[in-house]
């Protein structure tokens, strides 16, 4: 339990019908007494005036008191539900901050206290922020699944399996004369493979959850007048970019946030790439390259009426040479309605080639399907959970150590090395739920939350 009491507005700033102020800590009951003038009945809504120190009424509304440990934070919690005007909220917060021992909450501090008081684990705490930030119905459902503990349960199942296997392996190590027989009887190998398979399934679901949370950054790049802005408009379903026959119309970066079957995409249109003499256009081209360097995928736009080539190295070798190897590329042969080429995905080599008409929209559905496939997005997120980059990293490290352990078991019957790899694997999994997390990591996570959460 912490010794200080915190206060913050729990509802979004600005005007609204209702505004909620949340107080958590050992002085929550004292705050209730001083602001409402009475001792509140636990877990009971009372309509009361909210008073200044001199007894004048600042507002009136509903007061709710939740004594520890049966509250969101696990501490004594007070909620004041008043009128949602910013002036009223500010007056009430100033009134509460005037009470000795009460301070303003840091961003995410209520959720942090809930985590520290074992009211939720770290993935559930993160899911609160993800639920608030959800940009689609599918993302909200996934965040809610994580908040309800689905991701945590999957991790806990893995950890329990690891613990049982570690006990067996370490017992074998304690009896050196029988260690080889223990390790070679097939149980260890079978249990280890089952854990690896289970972890692979969790990683696949977590990758879907990360896509749902973070989206995919797709940059449309190419020479001027290749149809980049027309493709942005076709994908977004609206006239986001100005389209003309004049080369260099787009001089800055244009962004649109869209969804394809629930998968969030950040589509970025960039200035046409060429040797420009105009200073403004030069700046736009440099910004284009900056965006390309940060992309998950680049759509390399080609005007199909100017070349028959399909290999980007034949079309523009300098572009291919400058593109980072880690970034996937799809070649888009635009204006297929004018060249008479067959629309859609023409082959699935690297890079994939798609023929379409950004102007008419023909072939654009094939591109949408292709983008989902590039991210490994199935679209079947019912029951899925939300995941973050740190979760994927921890799962990846866990998988690597399991692989090392399996190699040591199968190749050398090295029980001690296997036991150590299992221990490290468990440590990485515990980082996800917060059972083993540094204070620095916790600080970074909760500081990104809203104040009042």
UniProtKB/Swiss-Prot annotation:
GO biological process: tRNA methylation; tRNA wobble uridine modification
Binding site for Mg(2+): 229, 250
Enzyme class: hydrolase
Cofactor binding description: Binds 1 potassium ion per subunit.
The entry's keywords: Cytoplasm, GTP-binding, Hydrolase, Magnesium, Metal-binding, Nucleotide-binding, Potassium, tRNA processing
GO molecular function, one term: metal ion binding
SUPFAM superfamilies, sorted: P-loop containing nucleoside triphosphate hydrolases, TrmE connector domain
Recorded family membership: Belongs to the TRAFAC class TrmE-Era-EngA-EngB-Septin-like GTPase superfamily. TrmE GTPase family.
Listed NCBIfam families: mnmE_trmE_thdF, PRK05291.1-3, small_GTP
Description of how the protein assembles with itself and partners: Homodimer. Heterotetramer of two MnmE and two MnmG subunits.
Record's protein name: tRNA modification GTPase MnmE
Organism the protein comes from: Vibrio campbellii (strain ATCC BAA-1116)
């Amino acid at each position: 339990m912490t010794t200080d009491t915190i206060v913050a507005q729990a509802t979004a700033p600005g005007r609204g019908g209702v505004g909620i102020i949340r107080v958590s800590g050992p002085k929550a009951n004292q705050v209730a007494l001083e602001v409402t003038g009475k001792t509140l009945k636990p877990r009971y809504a009372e309509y009361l005036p909210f008073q200044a120190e001199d007894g004048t009424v600042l507002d009136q509304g509903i007061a709710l008191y939740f004594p520890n440990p049966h509250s969101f934070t696990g501490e004594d919690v007070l909620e004041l539900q008043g009128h949602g005007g910013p002036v009223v909220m500010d007056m009430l917060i100033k009134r509460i901050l005037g009470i000795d021992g009460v301070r303003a909450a840091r961003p995410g501090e209520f959720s942090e206290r809930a985590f520290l008081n074992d009211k939720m684990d770290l993935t559930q705490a993160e899911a609160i922020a993800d639920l608030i930030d959800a940009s689609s119905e599918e993302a909200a459902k996934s965040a809610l699944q994580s908040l309800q503990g689905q991701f945590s349960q999957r991790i806990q199942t893995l950890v329990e399996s690891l613990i049982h296997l570690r006990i067996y392996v370490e017992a074998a190590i304690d009896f050196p004369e029988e260690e080889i027989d223990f390790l070679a009887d097939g149980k260890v190998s079978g249990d280890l493979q089952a854990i690896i398979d289970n972890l692979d399934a969790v990683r696949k679901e977590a990758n879907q959850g990360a896509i749902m949370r973070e989206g995919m950054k797709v940059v449309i790049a190419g020479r001027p007048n290749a149809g980049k802005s027309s493709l942005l408009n076709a994908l977004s379903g609206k006239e986001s970019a100005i389209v003309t026959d004049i080369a260099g119309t787009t001089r800055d970066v244009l962004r649109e946030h869209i969804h394809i079957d629930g998968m969030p995409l950040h589509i970025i249109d960039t200035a046409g790439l060429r040797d420009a003499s105009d200073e403004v256009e030069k700046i736009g081209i440099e910004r284009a390259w900056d965006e390309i360097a940060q992309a998950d995928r680049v759509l390399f736009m080609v005007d199909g009426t100017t070349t028959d080539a399909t290999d980007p190295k034949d079309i523009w070798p300098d572009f291919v040479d400058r593109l980072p190897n880690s970034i996937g590329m799809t070649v888009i042969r635009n204006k297929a309605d004018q060249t008479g080429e067959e629309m859609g995905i023409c082959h699935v080599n690297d890079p994939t080639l798609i023929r379409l008409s950004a102007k008419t929209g023909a072939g654009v559905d094939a591109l949408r399907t292709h983008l989902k496939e590039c991210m490994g997005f199935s679209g079947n997120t019912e029951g899925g959970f939300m995941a973050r980059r740190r979760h994927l990293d921890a799962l990846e490290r866990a998988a690597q150590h399991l692989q090392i352990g399996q190699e040591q078991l199968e190749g050398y019957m090295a029980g001690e090395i296997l036991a150590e790899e299992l221990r490290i694997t468990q440590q990485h999994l515990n980082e996800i739920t917060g059972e083993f997390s540094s204070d620095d990591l916790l600080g970074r996570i909760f500081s990104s939350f809203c104040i009042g959460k």
